[in-house]
UniProtKB/Swiss-Prot annotation:
Compositional bias segments (type: Basic and acidic residues): 346-363
Chain's gene name: ATF2
Compositional bias (Low complexity): 318-334, 455-467
Residues recorded as bearing Phosphothreonine in the entry: T52, T69, T71, T73, T116
Keyword set includes Ribosomal protein: no
CDD domains, sorted: bZIP_ATF2, GCN4_cent
Mutation effect (T69A): Weak histone acetyltransferase activity
Protein name according to UniProt: Cyclic AMP-dependent transcription factor ATF-2
Modified residues (Phosphoserine): S62, S90, S112, S121, S136, S328, S340, S367, S442, S446, S490, S498
Region described as Basic motif: spans on this chain: 354-374
Domain notes: The nuclear export signal 1 (N-NES) negatively regulates its nuclear localization and transcriptional activity.
CC terms in the record's Gene Ontology section: chromatin; cytoplasm; H4 histone acetyltransferase complex; mitochondrial outer membrane; nucleoplasm; nucleus; RNA polymerase II transcription regulator complex; site of double-strand break
Location of region: Essential for its histone acetyltransferase activity: 296-299
Modification note: Phosphorylation of Thr-69 by MAPK14 and MAPK11, and at Thr-71 by MAPK1/ERK2, MAPK3/ERK1, MAPK11, MAPK12 and MAPK14 in response to external stimulus like insulin causes increased transcriptional activity. Phosphorylated by PLK3 following hyperosmotic stress. Also phosphorylated and activated by JNK and CaMK4. ATM-mediated phosphorylation at Ser-490 and Ser-498 stimulates its function in DNA damage response. Phosphorylation at Ser-62, Thr-73 and Ser-121 activates its transcriptional activity. Phosphorylation at Thr-69 or Thr-71 enhances acetylation of histones H2B and H4.
C-alpha cells in the first residue's frame, strides 16, 4: 500500500515538473493558476483579467434611474439654464455710463444764466403739465426731471405744478396765448438735443407778473443725492407773441434727454441689434415731423411738436409727438399707430416666440433653396437631353457618310480596268508622277463638262493597282464634295482620250 502511494506521488510530481517545463509562464492574478507556453499568451490572458467587468452590488428594483439621454429638448433646456440664449450686454454700456457720470461731475452747478417762464398772477386751478419721454441712443440711468414744486407768486395763494427739464443754458422763446390761455414754452437750441414743456391753464385775462424771487428746483444726481438749485426769475431777450386763439386741451410733448445729463430711464430693456435695424427701417419709411415745427389746425386746434434732431436713430419709443383736441380724431395717423403697435409687439415678444419665428424663417429659406436647386437640376437635365439627341443625330450622319464612302470605293475598284484608264496609261499623261504615285485632278472651265484625270503607276503587280484605285476613289470623293451644289453630273471626258481616240480608229 505504501509502495503504491509512493509511485502515485512520484508520477504526480513528474507530471507537474513536465507541465512546468512545457508552460513556464504562470498567471499572477489572484485565484488563477493558469500557465502558458510563451509570454505573449500570458500577456493576452492578463489583458482579459484587466478587461473583466466589475459589477457593483445588486440594485433593488425600487431604484429608478433618471434618463440622461441627450435629446434636443434637453439640450435646449440646458442651453437656457446656462444662459446661451440670453442677449449679451453691450460692451460700451459701462463706458457710456462712466462718460455720462464724468460729464455730470464736470458740469458747473451755477445755473444763474438760466431763465424761467413767466407765470400768471392769479390762477383758479393748478396747472397740469403732461410730459412723455423720448429716449436718446445714450443710456441714462436716472431722471433729472424735478419734482412738482410750489412756485411763490405775487398775488395768488394756490400753487402751480410745473415740470422743467434743463436741456440747455437758455430759454430763447416764450409763447403766451391770451384766448384760451395756454402757455407754450419751447426750447429751440442749436445743440443736437431740444426740450419742449407745454403748460395749460384755464381761461383768464389777468395781467402777467414775473416771479419776484428765484425759482427753486431739485436736481437728482445718479448717485441718489438730491441737490437744490436756485434759478433767477428774470427773462432776458425773450420774445412774447400773443396770437388770437390756440386751443389746447390735452397737450403732450416729448422731452428728449441731453447728452451729459442723465434722463429718465427707459422702461424697456436694451434690445438687440436686429430689432434696432428693423425699427430704423420703419422709422425711415414713416419720417416724423422735423424739430421746431408747430402745426396749428384751423378748426381743430392741432399742435404737433417734434424734436427729431435729439436722436438720429432713437428706436425704443414712437417717433411722433402729437397734441390734439378730442374733437378732431380724424387728424390721427393710423400709420403711426400701427408702427408703434408693431414696435411694442416686437419689444414684448418672449424668447420662445422669437425662436419659433426664427425656425420658420429658416424653414422657408431652406424650401426656397431646395426649389432653386430643383429648377437648376431640371435645366441641366434638359440641356443634357438636348445634347444627347444632337450627338445621336451627328453619329447617324457620320454612319451614313461612311457607308457612302465604302460604296464609292467599291464602285471605283470595280472600274479599275476601265479602257479609259488604259488609254491614259498609253498616252503617258502622267509620266512625271510615276515615282511618287500621286494624283492630279483637272476641272475644265466649261460649266457643262467635267474632266476627271486619273494618274496611275504602271507596275506589274496587283497591289500597286489597288492602292491606285483607292487614291482615285479618294480624289473622286473630294471632287463630289466640292461640286455637291452644282447640277447633275455631266459627261466625264478624259482630256488625252479626246485626241488619241481618232488616231486609234
Amino acid at each position: 500500500m505504501k509502495f503504491k502511494l509512493h509511485v502515485n506521488s512520484a508520477r504526480q510530481y513528474k507530471d507537474l515538473w513536465n507541465m512546468s517545463d512545457d508552460k513556464p509562464f504562470l498567471c499572477t492574478a489572484p485565484g488563477c493558476g493558469q500557465r502558458f507556453t510563451n509570454e505573449d499568451h500570458l500577456a493576452v490572458h492578463k489583458h482579459k483579467h484587466e478587461m473583466t467587468l466589475k459589477f457593483g452590488p445588486a440594485r433593488n428594483d425600487s431604484v429608478i434611474v433618471a434618463d440622461q439621454t441627450p435629446t434636443p429638448t434637453r439640450f435646449l433646456k440646458n442651453c437656457e439654464e446656462v444662459g446661451l440664449f440670453n442677449e449679451l450686454a453691450s460692451p460700451f454700456e459701462n463706458e457710456f455710463k462712466k462718460a455720462s457720470e464724468d460729464d455730470i461731475k464736470k458740469m458747473p452747478l451755477d445755473l444763474s444764466p438760466l431763465a424761467t417762464p413767466i407765470i400768471r398772477s392769479k390762477i383758479e386751478e393748478p396747472s397740469v403739465v403732461e410730459t412723455t419721454h423720448q429716449d436718446s441712443p445714450l443710456p441714462h440711468p436716472e431722471s433729472t426731471t424735478s419734482d412738482e414744486k410750489e412756485v411763490p407768486l405775487a398775488q395768488t395763494a394756490q400753487p402751480t405744478s410745473a415740470i422743467v427739464r434743463p436741456a440747455s443754458l437758455q430759454v430763447p422763446n416764450v409763447l403766451l396765448t391770451s384766448s384760451d390761455s395756454s402757455v407754450i414754452i419751447q426750447q429751440a437750441v442749436p445743440s443736437p438735443t431740444s426740450s419742449t414743456v407745454i403748460t395749460q391753464a384755464p381761461s383768464s385775462n389777468r395781467p402777467i407778473v414775473p416771479v419776484p424771487g428765484p425759482f427753486p428746483l431739485l436736481l437728482h444726481l445718479p448717485n441718489g443725492q438730491t441737490m437744490p438749485v436756485a434759478i433767477p426769475a428774470s427773462i432776458t431777450s425773450s420774445n412774447v407773441h400773443v396770437p388770437a386763439a390756440v386751443p389746447l386741451v390735452r397737450p403732450v410733448t416729448m422731452v428728449p434727454s441731453v447728452p451729459g445729463i442723465p434722463g429718465p430711464s427707459s422702461p424697456q430693456p436694451v434690445q438687440s441689434e436686429a430689432k434696432m435695424r428693423l425699427k430704423a427701417a420703419l422709422t425711415q419709411q414713416h419720417p416724423p415731423v422735423t424739430n421746431g415745427d408747430t402745426v396749428k389746425g384751423h378748426g381743430s386746434g392741432l399742435v404737433r411738436t417734434q424734436s427729431e434732431e435729439s436722436r438720429p436713430q432713437s428706436l425704443q419709443q414712437p417717433a411722433t409727438s402729437t397734441t390734439e383736441t378730442p374733437a378732431s380724431p380724424a387728424h390721427t395717423t393710423p400709420q403711426t399707430q400701427s408702427t408703434s403697435g408693431r414696435r411694442r409687439r416686437a419689444a414684448n415678444e418672449d424668447p420662445d416666440e422669437k425662436r419659433r419665428k426664427f425656425l420658420e424663417r429658416n424653414r422657408a429659406a431652406a424650401s426656397r433653396c431646395r426649389q432653386k436647386r430643383k429648377v437648376w437640376v431640371q435645366s441641366l437635365e434638359k440641356k443634357a437631353e438636348d445634347l444627347s439627341s444632337l450627338n445621336g443625330q451627328l453619329q447617324s450622319e457620320v454612319t451614313l457618310l461612311r457607308n457612302e464612302v465604302a460604296q464609292l470605293k467599291q464602285l471605283l475598284l470595280a472600274h479599275k480596268d476601265c479602257p479609259v484608264t488604259a488609254m491614259q496609261k498609253k498616252s503617258g499623261y502622267h509620266t512625271a508622277d510615276k515615282d511618287d504615285s500621286s494624283e492630279d485632278i483637272s476641272v475644265p472651265s466649261s460649266p457643262h463638262t467635267e474632266a476627271i484625270q486619273h494618274s496611275s503607276v504602271s507596275t506589274s503587280n496587283g497591289v500597286s493597282s489597288t492602292s491606285k484605285a483607292e487614291a482615285v476613289a479618294t480624289s473622286v470623293l473630294t471632287q463630289m464634295a466640292d461640286q455637291s451644289t452644282e447640277p447633275a453630273l455631266s459627261q466625264i471626258v478624259m482630256a488625252p482620250s479626246s485626241q488619241s481616240q481618232p488616231s486609234g480608229s
